[in-house]
Amino acid sequence: MEKVLVTGGAGYIGSHTVLELLEAGYSPVVIDNFHNAIRGEDSMPESLRRVQELTGRSVEFEEMDILDQAALQHLFKKHSFKAVIHFAGLKAVGESVQKPLDYYRVNLTGTIQLLEIMRAHGVKNLVFSSSATVYGNPQYLPLDEAHPTGGCTNPYGKSKFFIEEMIRDLCRADTAWNAVLLRYFNPIGAHASGRIGEDPQGIPNNLMPYVSQVAIGRREALNVFGDDYATEDGTGVRDYIHVVDLAKGHIAALKKLKEQCGCRTYNLGTGTGYSVLQMVQAMEKASGKKIPYKVVARREGDVAACYANPSLAHEELGWTAALGLDRMCEDLWRWQKQNPSGFGAQA
């Protein structure tokens, strides 16, 4: 069984990907520093404890920070990894504007150290979590992989763009490297069991966890940031993708690495954009609850509309998002209902 290192594997996308790795017969080794994960029994992240329960397989986990070089060295000596899936990093757009150095230190330095240690141990296969934020303000829609990158509107997006460039340069300099850069659009939803899902710490930065917390009664009302965008109903349009589809994209990416693919970049999205108000409606339908909202000022750095052309991933990875909006909302609602306080308190 192939050993794959998953950094940041206890988080939202990471934990769903670890589950898919197990289902696909890989042997994942997970590191995480609990920045975005809840500690369960035996110092195991609660998300991964539940992944073990769902799959009946055990997950090897070590608490570790990607900035801790000595610990990473030790890990790579102990295991012989075939590939690395790199999720670890800071990810809140708004916070990145306030704390740019934190974002550059963790995301850039952390990745550089990881790449150096991979190189030293001859592990030259990488899947990287990038983001549609690398496109900046869309010059045209839908966004394909040829759309210019780098006009990012915040340090989070810039950090993802810089890392993409770094990996690209590395693959150019040494053709033994293979990397797949996955540009995520907006992952939502949860595993169909309702046992794992997104559990933001504090006030959610993303729309759907906030909406579902309003539906369950944890929050009063949703703030809609601007209704004067040049979109059909004036609210921001995004490409929402089911987290399970997204996780499966990482399995397809690992297979691609085996073809000695060099550096490849793919959008992971559905190709369909939905507005904030359409998402509120869809969530009202799934939950049977009314979701009160109020319109407030636009948020700095937000673009009017952003959605993918996902056809390259379909052609080259054989991957397509299969789960639609209703399913995303139903699964999100099941998770929220079964875990009203997330992983922290057992429902």
From Swiss-Prot:
Residues that, per the record, bind substrate: 131-133, 184-186, 205-207, 223-225, 238, 299-302
Domain of life the protein comes from: Eukaryota
UniProt cross-references to SUPFAM superfamilies, sorted A to Z: NAD(P)-binding Rossmann-fold domains
One GO-annotated biological process of the protein: glycolytic process from galactose
Keywords on record: Carbohydrate metabolism, Galactose metabolism, Isomerase, NAD
Positions that bind NAD(+): 11-13, 32-36, 65-66, 87, 91, 160, 184
Record has Nucleus as a keyword: no
Co-factor requirement: NAD(+)
Catalytic activity, EC: 5.1.3.2, 5.1.3.7
Pathway info: Carbohydrate metabolism; galactose metabolism
Record bears the keyword Metal-binding: no
Quaternary assembly: Homodimer.
Function (record text): Catalyzes two distinct but analogous reactions: the reversible epimerization of UDP-glucose to UDP-galactose and the reversible epimerization of UDP-N-acetylglucosamine to UDP-N-acetylgalactosamine. The reaction with UDP-Gal plays a critical role in the Leloir pathway of galactose catabolism in which galactose is converted to the glycolytic intermediate glucose 6-phosphate. It contributes to the catabolism of dietary galactose and enables the endogenous biosynthesis of both UDP-Gal and UDP-GalNAc when exogenous sources are limited.
Full protein name: UDP-glucose 4-epimerase
Naturally occurring in which organism (per UniProt): Mus musculus (Mouse)
Organism placement in taxonomy: Eukaryota, Metazoa, Chordata, Craniata, Vertebrata
